């Protein structure tokens, strides 16, 4: 769910400790063993849902993104055991499996933006940059009284406004000199007993989240401005297992399973509609909204719950994502994908002399592809078989080839090269 509004910033507060994570280096945590998607599950007929396709509205999409998790938990509050680790494992796994088509993030690659008349498809390219545990007290409630005075709201001890959430994100960014720009997304998680209002003037039936009814919304994504730059942020209140936001399954055996489903909903929407000017349908529904609580086929189950996605070897129960190409909600991209390889000659290149790169690409029914080569000296090429001259020696550099078909499906090939 996107939120197309701005809010007034308030005074800043200090941020908590930042734990920087190199996603590719994190070992998988101990836990259940998960099977891979079966052929039947992978190639099952997509389930159609009502409504029109999402359409492009002229704004940017995310071709790559860096993700940060902020857990705002003052000393008098707490999260259940395993909640934070399940969330961080999810972000780590999504980053690890970048460029694959085996999970729902591969569905996003059919969408694109247009700059100066050039269409550029999304690449499933995510980096998990770190976790911030913020422990400063919550501010006094700025929400309408009925949120805390209602029967359901009596379980709430505080209600955070969107302006207060924005202030916290700015504080964390400033306190740790973190990056800005729409390629950076900050997910804010709050503990049990914390309500939230995303609109400046909510009504009793719309605009607020409370820990029991969880009505109005389960989470939202939006953007703010700090230091003259836009930043994406997502608000994810704690999901009670008795509330309507609960996903219904817990394959990892803790309450973090449900909020991970909600995070995936918002993350996919942020990729395709970061500023509210990207992809959504005639009713304003984004690719996650159109498939809310539509989960599709399970792959298998652990002793504590079913899972329908295996990402970096871990199982998750995640809602499906809308695919224009399939005209349905789907769990993963099941259409034909390009396969690619390349070689270079001479096999022992010398700097100052020409190196020829030759690629081979195939995909059933497709003959037109786009190519993007990146070389370890910073060079780039966009033809099928480029030549490149390395001005200096290179010790174990990386050459990357990304091949895209007309539908946004991609093949990625990486090879090392040493230039003497």
Regions picked out by a protein language model, each given a short descriptive name:
Residues 324-420:
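Extracellular/lumenal mature domains of secreted and surface-exposed proteins
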């Amino acid at each position: 769910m996107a939120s197309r509004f701005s809010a007034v910033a308030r005074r800043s507060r200090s941020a908590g400790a930042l734990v920087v994570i190199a996603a590719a280096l994190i070992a998988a945590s101990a836990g259940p063993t998960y099977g891979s998607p079966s052929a039947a599950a992978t190639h099952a007929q997509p389930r159609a849902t009502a409504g029109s396709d999402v359409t492009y509205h002229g704004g940017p999409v995310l071709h790559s993104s860096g993700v940060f998790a902020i857990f705002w938990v003052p000393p008098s509050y707490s999260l259940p055991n395993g909640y934070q680790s399940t969330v961080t494992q999810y972000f780590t796994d999504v980053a690890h499996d970048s460029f694959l088509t085996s999970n729902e993030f591969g569905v996003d690659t059919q969408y694109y933006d247009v700059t100066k008349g050039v269409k550029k498809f999304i690449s499933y390219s995510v980096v998990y940059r770190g976790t911030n545990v913020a422990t400063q007290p919550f501010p006094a409630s700025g929400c309408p009284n009925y949120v805390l005075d209602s029967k359901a709201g009596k379980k709430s001890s505080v209600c955070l406004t969107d302006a207060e959430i924005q202030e916290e994100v700015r504080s964390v960014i400033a306190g740790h000199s973190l990056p800005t720009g729409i390629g950076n997304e900050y997910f804010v998680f709050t503990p049990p007993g914390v309500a939230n209002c995303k609109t400046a003037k909510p009504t009793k039936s719309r605009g607020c989240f409370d820990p029991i009814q969880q009505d109005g919304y389960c989470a939202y994504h939006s953007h703010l401005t700090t230091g003259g730059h836009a930043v994406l942020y997502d608000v994810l209140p704690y999901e009670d297992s008795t509330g309507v936001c609960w996903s219904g399954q817990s394959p990892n055996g803790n309450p973090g399973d449900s909020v991970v489903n909600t995070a995936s909903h918002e993350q996919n929407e942020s990729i395709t509609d970061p500023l509210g000017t990207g992809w959504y349908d005639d009713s304003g529904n984004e690719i996650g909204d159109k498939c809310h609580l539509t989960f599709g086929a399970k792959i298998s189950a652990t002793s504590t719950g079913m899972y329908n996605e295996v990402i970096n070897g871990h199982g998750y129960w995640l809602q499906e994502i809308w695919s224009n190409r399939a005209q349905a909600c789907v769990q993963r991209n099941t259409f034909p994908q390009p396969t690619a390889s390349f070689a270079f000659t001479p096999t022992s290149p010398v700097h100052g002399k020409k190196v020829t790169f030759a690629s081979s690409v195939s995909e059933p029914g497709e003959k037109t592809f786009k190519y993007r080569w990146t070389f370890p000296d910073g060079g780039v090429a966009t033809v099928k078989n480029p030549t490149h001259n390395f001005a200096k020696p290179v010790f174990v550099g990386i050459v990357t080839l990304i091949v895209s078909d007309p539908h946004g499906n991609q093949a990625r090939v990486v090879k090392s090269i040493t230039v003497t």
